[in-house]
Amino acid sequence: MLAGCRVALPRGLRCCQRVLSWVPVVIISLVVLWSYYAYVWELCLVTVTNPAEKAAYLLIFHTVFLLFIWTYWKAIFTPPKQPTKKFLLPYAEKERYDNEERPEAQKQIVAEFARKLPVYTRTGSGATRFCDTCQMVKPDRCHHCSVCGMCVLKMDHHCPWVNNCIGYSNYKFFLLFLAYAMLYCLYIGCTVFQYFILYWTDTLSNGRAKFHVLFLLFVALMFFISLMFLFGYHCWLVSLNRTTLEAFSTPVFQSGPDKNGFHLGIRRNLEQVFGKERKLWLIPVFTSLGDGFTYPMRMACESRNPLLAAENQWEDDLTDEESQAYCETSHITVHIEK
């Protein structure tokens, strides 16, 4: 894999940038640690008196907590996958590109090299997608992250709360992190609520525990509402096989822009992210389909076989292998006007 193609910055500035980028993660970690203390100690061990209730609360809480922490860890420390060297402009072409002053001639150099690569999406003007910073042709759905300083396969967005770029290699972990974070907040809110009422009405009077329990409910509710909207938005994206970037900027193919260019049907869209083994969908292990460089495309398939477009209106049961087989027979060529 390629090392990150980073813009040259003074060493001191880079160091400060790296340190500051961890601030949101530290904030979230401190809130989670406090919530663990408040729930386990102040609620379960101090406030709850029924032994059976206490044991049940602690058992379920730690199960949800471990899943939440596991997915958060994976979202933070799973590096985004980068394009391989075959997408990097070779030395000879790079020399020609750098020495050429005419933009049209530069586009022609890139287009000639890109004909050897499995790339089908284009810029808005129809040119080959090329990263000037990394000096490489961008694979489909790949974008350059200015924060990470590198091109990321199937880039969705850069998330400051995990200090990582979310893309092909870790999007499943990010979704599971949102889901288990919501479940964590929901479970805390549901189990704390009855004791919140008791403290609020002064039925219980433990001063220190009262503060933690009352504040715990407010924090859990606040995070749950925020996460609910974010998770719902990403569920919508997954159902359409889109990334956040593609939702804001429609992918462009040879025949033009198509916001549903990668839409394969809800079931197959889910499998693109979570894989075919449903027993592994809720576990933070990598199961996404493909290699990160090529993707089944509805537009490519339909342009090759127009009957497929009508057929898809009635049947949505093609396997990913069949869909990919259709797409692999379709090749898109860029024509540069002189």
Swiss-Prot record:
Bilayer-spanning residue ranges: 21-41, 57-77, 173-193, 211-234
Keywords, ordered alphabetically: Acyltransferase, Golgi apparatus, Lipoprotein, Membrane, Metal-binding, Palmitate, Synapse, Transferase, Transmembrane, Transmembrane helix, Zinc
GO biological process, one term: peptidyl-L-cysteine S-palmitoylation
Positions with a binding annotation for Zn(2+) 1: C131, C134, H144, C151
EC number(s) stated in the UniProt entry for this protein: 2.3.1.225, 2.3.1.-
Domain DHHC stretches: 129-179
Active site per UniProt: C159 (s-palmitoyl cysteine intermediate)
Residues the record lists as binding Zn(2+) 2: C145, C148, H158, C165
Cytoplasmic side: 1-20, 78-172, 235-338
Subcellular location: Golgi apparatus membrane; Postsynaptic density
Primary subcellular site in the record, as a coarse category: Golgi
PTM annotation: Autopalmitoylated (in vitro).
Pfam families according to UniProt: DHHC
Gene Ontology CC terms, in alphabetical order: endoplasmic reticulum; Golgi apparatus; Golgi membrane; postsynaptic density
Catalysed reactions, as listed in the record: L-cysteinyl-[protein] + hexadecanoyl-CoA = S-hexadecanoyl-L-cysteinyl-[protein] + CoA; L-cysteinyl-[protein] + tetradecanoyl-CoA = S-tetradecanoyl-L-cysteinyl-[protein] + CoA; L-cysteinyl-[protein] + octadecanoyl-CoA = S-octadecanoyl-L-cysteinyl-[protein] + CoA
Membrane topology: Multi-pass membrane protein
Gene Ontology molecular function, alphabetical: protein-cysteine S-myristoyltransferase activity; protein-cysteine S-palmitoyltransferase activity; protein-cysteine S-stearoyltransferase activity; zinc ion binding
Record PANTHER family: PALMITOYLTRANSFERASE ZDHHC16
Function in brief: Palmitoyltransferase that catalyzes the addition of palmitate onto various protein substrates. Has no stringent fatty acid selectivity and in addition to palmitate can also transfer onto target proteins myristate from tetradecanoyl-CoA and stearate from octadecanoyl-CoA. May thereby regulate target proteins association and localization to membranes. In the nervous system, probably catalyzes the palmitoylation of synaptic proteins and is involved in the differentiation of dopaminergic neurons and the development of the diencephalon.
Family (UniProt): Belongs to the DHHC palmitoyltransferase family.
Domain observations: The DHHC domain is required for palmitoyltransferase activity.
Protein name: Palmitoyltransferase ZDHHC15
Source organism (scientific name): Xenopus laevis (African clawed frog)
Lineage: Eukaryota, Metazoa, Chordata, Craniata, Vertebrata
